[in-house]
Amino acid sequence: MKNLTRRFLQAAMFGCCFLTSLFGAEEKKIVCFGDSLTSCGGKDGRYSDMLQRSLPGYRIINSGKGGDTLGGGLARLDQAVLQHHAQYLVIGLGANDYWRRKRTLNELKKDYEEILSRCTAAGMKIVVISCFGNEKLPPGATLDFDRAGLPLEHYAAGIALIERELVKKYHAGYVPDMQCGITPKGRRDLWSDSNHPNAAGNRIVADTILPELRTILK
């Protein structure tokens, strides 16, 4: 009986190895999750499309949605990210919260942390991409994390502080300024409008993201 059991287990292990070699290992997936800066660029012109060309061994899923905010991203997290069972996440949210200035920095931090916490709990490795990471408060200014309607430069500096704190806490990669290669915006050939890169601009954005992304793919 013991011999039969041993042979059965050996056969089962052989079968698993055979199926793995036949169908390949688990598919490696990266979700790019964000607002219009993730969805812009047109057909084959999004930064995620450029990343796909540089990383042919991965399937890259674009979950960008124009106008999205941190609260909106949290609300659609299951459908846009977690249902894909991806191993990696590139997340860029906060630009529309910055423009609207309707919520406090503490509210934004709470939503961002819940997103990162849930994705980390799902086993995902994360890169946070930003437009604000190099922003600083004006000299002599202080941040009020409990008041909405702050000046734009205060929001930018506050979001940068939130990002730096959370990437450290969740051991995430960080791209402080995803658009550093296409600003100042005098390069009109890289922009489809005043806020959104075109395909040529997104090629540079992808090249800016790629080195940090590779660090979590190792």
Where in this protein do the model-derived segments appear?
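N-terminal export leaders
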Residues: M1, T5-Q10
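Solvent-exposed loop/turn segments at secondary-structure junctions
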Residues: S36-S39, K65-L70, A95-W99, F132-K136, ...
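Active-site segments of SGNH/GDSL-like serine hydrolases
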Residues: G92, N96, L116-A157
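Catalytic His-Asp segment of secreted/periplasmic serine-dependent ester chemistry enzymes
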Residues: K43, K136-K218
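Internal alpha/beta domain cores that form substrate/cofactor-binding pockets in large enzymes
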Residues: Y58-R76, A80-H84, D97-I126
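Serine-esterase "nucleophile elbow" of acetyl-processing enzymes
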Residues: F23-Y88
